């Protein structure tokens, strides 16, 4: 869509919204920032360095006269398409996009796009590192931290963009067309937004909707949702599996990552050569290898990068050993399935901090995965009573409810003995206690690093 000189509403005044407005302004459109929160400090917002100069700001409700002037509306990922003002826009026949669709409108190169409930950040970061070693004009964007809108005007016909894409971002993607897509897994999450697993799965699968048989889609062979989806996938499917030797795809045999693409089995590397730990990370690595290889990166470059790649911040991140106790930060474990992977990676009796914002998930499988490994469960946040009841139902008795994060940390330090681990892996979002999981993880690390020993 040609937006030169057109007025575009950008809903949401966070990092994504400001990035979208900045892109529109640079591209010659006229952005108008909008937020329903009429109590937002507009003066402070407009004073931010990343606030697009001279951009109009509307707080509260949408003026009717503005509606008639708009050519497009762009929603930030945190804004649901079910919001009342979105219906107002649609009734006025104003197209509604998200930031991913807006960026795609200006994309000149190829895109490798990664989604899934868990593993997105690690996989995207690893693919980004591989591609950066392969070619200079590589951009790593999306849900990972740098908005796609911030980088897209730097792309050209030879560039590649590696994008981490969330379900919230896919909801408002219309023409987005990655050359290689990947869906790492689909497990319960964000059901407070998507309502049903069927809806959630459909949104994740929509990353492929504009792909063709000339494109590739990397899928997890162990995921029942993805097995059911594969026959409908418009792209060429490349499987990976941590449990089964595949006739075609990437798979784990003992400690060896192998592939067979129709020309016989090839051993690629031993997981002991990697810095990452845990089966979930072996899956992430297989997906990353498959994505990069499908794009055309030589295997030697891929494997050398994999061997030197370290865990991303806040995802089963080793922090320190204090007085014989190891501390791990898994603040990015914001749902039960992600937190299960962290528990499985622990090799020690574990004091676990869990709980946070309630996304309407269930916690039975998470509690069952403790398998006697969790010696004490310290619970915080909105879900603490809900999780405590679930844990008691499964026969767990060593449970403490803390009133604050600091109190939870104090309890953990007192309870942990030499040879134990203290793990922050909440299985819940951070909202309510923290602005995001990064702040939660940083607070954990600051506390640990302040300990003597």
Predicted regions, residues:
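C-terminal helical cap/extension that packs against the catalytic core
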Residues: 43-55, 364-420
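Short internal beta-strands
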Residues: 32-37, 217-221, 353-354, 373-382
